[in-house]
């Protein structure tokens, strides 16, 4: 009876998801919605490099430089082999691989919709909050954060199961999200999803500061802030509560998610600040080591930390995910002709192909 009920709830969640996606109300922007953006990006990078750009299909392009050519499908390039791509997509396997090498990863458990007991037990041992996600996936699809009860575990598992039958539950890690781009073994760029911040005035409680800021937000037509779980969790790891009076001029983070209109389910990570120079050598080396362990020459290493200037072991931060074929639209300003990273990637691919061609001729 219980399994039948879960199956019906999963069916209802799937139909709702399809309706929201079809109607454009899901709040999700997928790669198919960025075809024109990536076409312009790769075209501009090819021209800057002195190459020829050709459209093979609406979402498939070719760049030639002399006798060397490469192709890309939206954000996907010719880096990495299928085995590496498959490994990187298996989150539990990556956690085990990185954890065994001494890198910081989240505490986690693997479970399925057919057997929720491991997830229930894990949540009970992490009452401050958990994250439930499909064991394979990208872009926040099927992910629910700040899970704090059995009912929420079940609901989050149903959503995650729409994307994969193997599921993960992880301890919620305090901090902000960072994406470190590793190209050919070297970290070349980093961005951060900065959460909204407020400044204390030495007289008002945080609760009062939020009320005042929401007045401004209403006047400006912005989404209001509220004291939800993300807010309370974020304040708590800074040693704050809604009733704390913060010293005048002291800034504090109010929440980890910068999209105040969305809550905990399928929140897209929108990086809004370049922080390459803020990442300490220890975290930089961790990201580069993660890429070597996965075997990827082009990897996005996702880190959660309170402070990128100190090692993860000091801040309690983690490497929470790795992404092959990392999306370059995270790594440039919209007003730029193309991300400098696109040029670096294109140069690297063409150079590798030229070397391979030369080796083939010599052989």
Annotate each PLM feature.
Residues 132, 167, 299-301, 320:
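Hydrophobic faces of well-ordered beta-strands that scaffold small-molecule active sites
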Residues 64, 69-75, 79-229, 280-281:
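Active-site nucleotide/adenylate-binding loops and adjacent lid/helix of ATP-dependent enzymes
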Residues 245, 265-281, 292-298, 305-363:
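C-terminal active-site "lid" helix and adjoining low-complexity regulatory extension at the edge
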């Amino acid at each position: 009876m219980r399994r039948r009920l879960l199956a019906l709830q999963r069916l209802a969640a799937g139909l709702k998801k399809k309706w929201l996606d079809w109607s454009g109300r899901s709040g999700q922007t997928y790669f198919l919605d960025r075809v024109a953006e990536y076409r312009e990006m790769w075209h501009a990078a090819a021209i800057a490099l002195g190459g020829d750009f050709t459209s093979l299909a609406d979402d498939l392009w070719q760049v030639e430089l002399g006798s060397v050519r490469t192709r890309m499908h939206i954000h996907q390039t010719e880096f990495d082999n299928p085995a590496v791509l498959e490994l990187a997509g298996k989150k539990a396997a990556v956690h085990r691989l990185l954890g065994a090498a001494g890198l910081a990863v989240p505490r986690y458990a693997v479970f399925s919709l057919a057997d929720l007991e491991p997830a229930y037990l894990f949540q009970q041992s992490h009452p401050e909050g958990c994250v439930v996600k499909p064991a394979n996936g990208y872009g926040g699809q099927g992910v629910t954060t700040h899970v704090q009860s059995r009912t929420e575990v079940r609901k989050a598992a149903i959503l995650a199961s729409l994307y994969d039958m193997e599921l993960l539950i992880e301890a919620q890690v305090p901090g902000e999200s960072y994406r470190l781009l590793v190209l050919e073994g070297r970290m070349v760029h980093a961005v951060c999803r900065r959460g909204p911040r407020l400044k204390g005035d030495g007289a008002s409680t945080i609760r009062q500061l939020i009320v005042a800021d929401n007045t401004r937000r209403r006047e400006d037509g912005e989404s209001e802030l509220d004291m939800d779980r993300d807010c309370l969790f974020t304040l708590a790891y800074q040693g704050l509560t809604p009733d704390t009076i913060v010293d005048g001029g002291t800034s504090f983070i109010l929440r980890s998610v910068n999209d105040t209109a969305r809550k905990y389910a399928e929140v897209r990570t929108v990086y809004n600040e370049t922080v390459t120079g803020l990442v300490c050598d220890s975290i930089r080396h961790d990201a580069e080591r993660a890429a070597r362990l996965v075997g990827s020459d082009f990897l996005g290493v996702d880190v959660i930390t309170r402070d990128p200037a100190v090692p993860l072991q000091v801040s309690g931060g983690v490497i929470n995910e790795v992404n092959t074929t990392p999306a370059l639209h995270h790594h440039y300003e919209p007003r730029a002709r193309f991300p400098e990273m696109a040029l670096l990637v294109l140069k690297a691919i063409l150079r590798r192909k030229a070397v391979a061609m030369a080796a083939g001729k010599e052989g």
